[in-house]
Amino acid sequence: MNQHFHRGILFYHQAAGQGNLYKSLGQVTESLTQMCDDLTLKLSEEGGDIAKFCDDLTQNQNGVSYDVFFVLGGDGTVNELVNGVARNNLEIPIGIIPGGTFNDFTKTLNLSPRTAAAANELLNSKIKSFDVLKVNDTYALNFAGIGMMVQNSENVDANKKRILGKFSYVFTTLKVIANPKIYQYTIKANNEEYSGETSMILIANGNYVGGSKIPLEDLSPSDGEMNIFVFKNHNMSLIKDFFQVKDSLRWNDITENIRLITTDEMKLETRPSTKIDIDGEIMFDTPVDIKLLKDKVKLLYIDVNE
């Protein structure tokens, strides 16, 4: 049965649409107008516009109400909407339409990476509650991390990203692996303390990061737990270890280079202090407190079992 809503709003960014914004908007609205009696398009001109819209909506400053949100853009645009919804405790479901380089969480939602196809698939979507990471006072749908992933993001040239897309990250990743920064870390979780040296720590809620699937069979963004991957060294065997599929019960028994910690709350400290990547946005430095908020947002997804 097709999804149908009374009033919806589509947020989009000027850089969305995978190279052709207005063509993408036309394709997307063709599907979304079939889902909504009333559809509004809202351009995000500056960072923070979408979150502020959610703040104003909570205070009823907009004078209208909506029963579905859509967002066309990359992970950063999606992250802003998730923050606006989560911090205002809105119960409005979100439909994510890929319009950036990776759009990792759309893979978790079983949506096509192609803009028009994903919008069309939403016609037959279902609504499901998903967990969210709270990193200090910021929310993350997919991941948070330090180390090589931050180096990678900071070193990607904006022009190369525009021209090469995903390949720009590949080139930068190879350089970072060859010369990573090493940190002393302390993690407090599960009434225990973990410490040592690391080149990267990934705190995952979603199944995909940087366009690649995390090889943990029982990882789920709806299980009430976050999965912390601590990369102990930085040689090429680390990469081989990470991409061998395992389950959480056997991970630490068969993987020497990457420690797995599963929890719903943690504190991370590093020496020296370092920047943290939150769903592709680098916002502040360690130390950080991270909590897993169960069923915090509602998203449209495709049930592949039907």
UniProtKB/Swiss-Prot annotation:
What Pfam families has UniProt attached to this entry? DAGK_cat, YegS_C
Q: Name one GO biological process term.
A: phospholipid biosynthetic process
What's the cofactor?
Mg(2+)
Residues given in the record as Mg(2+) binding sites: S220, D223, E225
- Cofactor notes: Binds 1 Mg(2+) ion per subunit. This ion appears to have a structural role and is required for catalytic activity.
Q: Where does ATP bind?
A: S44, G74, D75, G76, T77, V78, N79, E80, T101
Similarity field: Belongs to the diacylglycerol/lipid kinase family.
Protein name as catalogued: Putative lipid kinase Sca_1050
Organism (species) = Staphylococcus carnosus (strain TM300)
